[in-house]
């Protein structure tokens, strides 16, 4: 068994720490707040984020050096906005042989960097050795040992397999991939569509509208991802359509809940205050909107959600705008993607 540090004691970090502890690993869970770490150690629960029993194999820390000293792997599970600061501090203490895995789904708005790119910039690590863990995985269900499947991805497949070995269990099945670009983009961009699904439900629309959002949202994700060099087939996998389905249809989803409040007429600032947790899709929509412009990629749903969030456009007007777009063939997207990928 191995020593693993999990950086980020929110709901997702706690759930992943539980998976690792169940597999017999020695787990160190890092929180940026000393009192939070102390409470976890005293009560063996994380009342603020994920109120379930925490195994004795998990010890919480607030000191980065203590957390990562001598570990075999580090799992980074902090919000996108904290990635650079946390990785800069991590880089001071981490051994060069340690496997670095991240499980954060987002894109930096200004730089348009994916999380793996941010990690590379802040740490002394080769980009090809960074691993991402992604897929349809609500923390609440993972912590309860409900069956869950995810993907670990890295250009260096040996690193991806190391992560696969660390996490695989009877209730947590892990696949591998070498398309880190596609896996990261699928995990990040689906949050935008989940906001849209929540808005749709908040407006009182039914299953037809949600199915349309998921399907056409997937087309947008694949268009942008392929334009950036991702394998289009990755978007048909766990981190693509899998994560899209679970995030768009579950009340566990922060992005769906935020969208639902927006659809009911609440303002963005009030929604974020009411949520009290990071809603990655709000930041990601800015990045995707800019990506679409830069890559000249058609992303009408993303554009509509951007208008609702940042241009104060009425959600019903955006729906009308989407429904009255120019007529087209549904298979145009698939034909273009496959031609770009497989033509000589």
UniProtKB/Swiss-Prot annotation:
Q: Keyword check for Electron transport, yes or no.
A: no
Matching entries from InterPro entries are given as: 6-PGluconate_DH-like_C_sf, 6PGD_dom2, G3P_DH_NAD-dep, G3P_DH_NAD-dep_C, G3P_DH_NAD-dep_N, NAD(P)-bd_dom_sf
Kindly list the positions annotated as binding NADPH: 11-12, 32-33, 105, 139, 254, 278, 280
Q: Tell me where in or outside the cell this protein is found.
A: Cytoplasm
Record keywords, A-Z: Cytoplasm, Lipid biosynthesis, Lipid metabolism, NAD, NADP, Nucleotide-binding, Oxidoreductase, Phospholipid biosynthesis, Phospholipid metabolism
- Any Pfam family the entry gives: NAD_Gly3P_dh_C
- Binding of sn-glycerol 3-phosphate occurs at 105, 135, 137, 190, 243, 253-255
Which residues are responsible for catalysis? 190 (proton acceptor)
Lineage, top-rank taxon, reads: Bacteria
Q: This protein is called what? A: Glycerol-3-phosphate dehydrogenase [NAD(P)+]
Q: Which organism is it from?
A: Oceanobacillus iheyensis (strain DSM 14371 / CIP 107618 / JCM 11309 / KCTC 3954 / HTE831)
